[in-house]
Amino acid sequence: MESDMKSSYYLIFISLLLLAGCSSHGDASAQSQSNGMAVAKAAFDSAQYEKAERLYLALLSSDASLEEAQLMLARTRYQQDKKQAARDGLQQLLDRAGKQAPEAANYLGKFLLDDGRTEQAATAYRQGLALPELTPLARARLSNGLGVASLRQGAFAKGRALFEAAVAAAPDEPDYRGNLALGWLMEGNRIAARQAFEPLLHYQSLPPQVEMNYALLLLAEGNEPQARLILSRFLSASQLEHDIRLLKAQLRGLSV
């Protein structure tokens, strides 16, 4: 009996060792994976895109289920002008509807907009917005993206409504509020555009695109000197004159 008990204790002890060993191996593997992701991200952030691609591919060869690595691989490929491969990778992530699907929808929509594929971008954003359990910030990003696509398609009221949803979820995000002001302006409502933009005037600095949206609002209000001052920080003299003429022509069709 005593021998049987000793044998049982021995088996339990061995089992615990095996469990501890598996846990230790799992921890080491997770740490190695985390370190690999950090090194790859550092390469991406320093614009070493070929190196970053190799590192992400190596990570995925060890674990093909790493969605964050798949997302970053697509972003890395887009930066190397491997645009179709990047879009395909993002679409696959989006279709699987996993944890990285909202980010995949966001980048896929953005890349398609950058390439002038507005209808496809709108489809990507809509697919992202249909995902279950979106966080408020993810919903705001996707609503903003779909709003931009809507403006480009001439659906100003729809775009403005989407920007309102984005601002409601993230009221301190200057891009969303700047786009909301632009949406109101495209609908011809300068007063609402000014009200939407007003909170941003207290910010110490704004993204360039938001400042350019403000310059457009100033032009609509008849404040061309101030609009020129803002635009001159981003455009050459010849570009400035060309864009001022173009913007003024576009604004002639707008009314309060």
Show where each model-derived region lies.
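Bacterial Sec signal peptide processing site at the extreme N-terminus
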Residues: 22-39
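Helix-start (N-cap) detector for alpha-helical repeat units in TPR-like alpha-solenoids
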Residues: 32-33, 67-68, 100-103, 136-140, ...
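Canonical tetratricopeptide repeat
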Residues: 72, 106-107, 141-145, 179, ...
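Terminal, low-structured helical/coil segments at or just beyond the last alpha-helical repeat
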Residues: 203-256
